[in-house]
């Protein structure tokens, strides 16, 4: 009897000082799409207001807290402990990937070091996260996209503010299609999605208000779509509209005598 395929084993390390407890449900739902969260640890000083919100949901998600008291101002013991644990877990050889939950660029080198070892890194942080950390991850998910449906008008307004307009996605989608160099311009949407993830680790249709890439592509109105029966959806860039013919102003007839000067007097 063939053995059952094992899900990728993941180590989830959360920086409580730079991640809101509101994302917890969405975070672990997203991680479940990647693999099994075998290790779940959170680092912070749970006596302060920022980290205290996590204390109420630790048991719900089986997260092991690593309490770090702030003995000295300006020194982040939580970050140091997280990095030490990450390296210990990496060298154990037991994990297929790491999920680093933080908006702090201090973890850029950690992410790069883990990937140098041939292990995937999935980052989770706010849209303000510096590009250096986002690009150090194989994939980066904005935590604004993990929040539950807004419960209040204020939450809805905040969510709306974090969304980017659909047209903002057009340039990078066009770039991917161009790079794929299809003879007739048509490319499979699924392949476009994979190439987008390779080109920009933080690309996510949810950032533009859509759960599916296909819905985002339709909304931009910048691509032709082929949904022929029995085949995967394909797209290509709409050809540029031809410029309207230039109107030429009719020439006015020359006035009598204008060309030859004044007529001689009789």
Task: Label each region the model flagged.
Residues 13, 43, 96-103, 110, ...:
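Acidic beta-strand-to-loop metal/phosphate-binding motif
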Residues 16, 21, 40, 108-112, ...:
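P-loop/Walker A NTP-binding module and the surrounding RecA-like catalytic core of P-loop NTPases
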Residues 1-91, 120:
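Domain-level signal for Mg2+-assisted phosphodiester chemistry and nucleotide/NA-binding surfaces
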Residues 122, 134-151:
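Conserved phosphate-handling catalytic cores of large alpha/beta enzymes
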Residues 61, 117, 135-137:
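Short, structured coil segments at secondary-structure junctions
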Residues 50-55, 125-134:
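Short, glycine/polar-rich helix-capping loops at beta-to-alpha or helix-loop-helix junctions
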Residues 73-75, 128-132, 147-150:
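Short gly/pro/ser/thr-enriched loop/turn and capping motifs at secondary-structure boundaries
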Residues 156-266:
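N-terminal regulatory modules in eukaryotic regulatory proteins
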